Amino acid sequence: MTSTRHDGDTWDLASSVGATATMAAVARAIATRADRRLIDDPFAAPLVRAVGIDLLTRLATGDVPPDGLVEQVAIDVAKVRARFYDEFFLEATNTGITQVVILASGLDSRAYRLPWPIGTVVYELDQPRVVEFKTRTLAALGAVPTADRRVAAVDLRDDWPAALRAAGFDPARPTAWSAEGLLGYLPPEAQDRLLDTVTELSAPESRVATENRPNPKPGDEDRTKEALNRISERWRAHSFDPDMARLRYYGERNETAPYLADRGWALTGISVRDLLAAHGLPPLRDDDLRMGDVRYVSGVRNKTTK
């Protein structure tokens, strides 16, 4: 598949960045079969099947074992990541927040699987082909949202605030935002713009959850690219070519946590390494992807000035 990033590129769930959303759903499907204590996503496997990539379907449904393709660490990280964001949303909405925004929602099914409080509105933003596919597929499965689900079919590089408002979003009300697994697929300046816009659209007492990846030390990114290329080679041997190293943006960028803190967000966080330990999962070993130092951060906006 063609996957090199360029300005204005688009995708579906079988190509480019969209394929990474499908691969993440594969990991959630495998994790759900292995350990419903941390994650229970009954829609992951059916959504992957509907995308139509045979290898990913067989992995998601258990017809092919993950050994050698989906490493155990990816499955374990899928478990703790899902749990972190699930708990974030439920805690936020149980405080009275009734607006939820999921940026780059991909195959996320939280609008269908979480026990949202009555009156919660969940806004999902993603490329038009992605949100149309998920809406159509889940409707065909007979799935019913557990919240008032609204979609904004828009590229996050375009005027997504206008699309969000058109769907009914009210920036005067507190909101719970997530940018899950998104920021590494944005250029550094686009990441800043996204976080600035989230802040501008956030009333006091809004909440946010995302990831903070430390800036690389010399040699870190070369090792990361080599590791991603090794992973892609394993997939190519099975006639699936995600070309993962070419989908991300590299180089230094503003780290998420201090950037948001400077804009009035009070944040806490926990590293992937500590989350794995907290849930009794095996530690990371050869961490060429630098996952262990990624911190999942969440917090509240209490200030109205930058």
From Swiss-Prot:
Keywords: Methyltransferase, S-adenosyl-L-methionine, Transferase
Region of interest (Disordered), ranges: 201-225
EC number: 2.1.1.-
Residue ranges of coiled coil: none
Cited InterPro entries: Ppm1/Ppm2/Tcmp (IPR007213), SAM-dependent_MTases_sf (IPR029063), SAM_mthyl_Trfase_ML2640-like (IPR011610)
Keyword Ribonucleoprotein: no
Top-rank EC class of the record's enzyme: transferase
Top-level taxon: Bacteria
UniProt-annotated binding residues for S-adenosyl-L-methionine: D126, D155, L156
GO molecular function, one term: methyltransferase activity
A single BP term in Gene Ontology: methylation
Annotated function: Exhibits S-adenosyl-L-methionine-dependent methyltransferase activity.
UniProt family annotation: Belongs to the UPF0677 family.
Name recorded for this polypeptide: Putative S-adenosyl-L-methionine-dependent methyltransferase FRAAL5401
Annotated source species: Frankia alni (strain DSM 45986 / CECT 9034 / ACN14a)
Top-level taxonomy: Bacteria, Bacillati, Actinomycetota, Actinomycetes, Frankiales
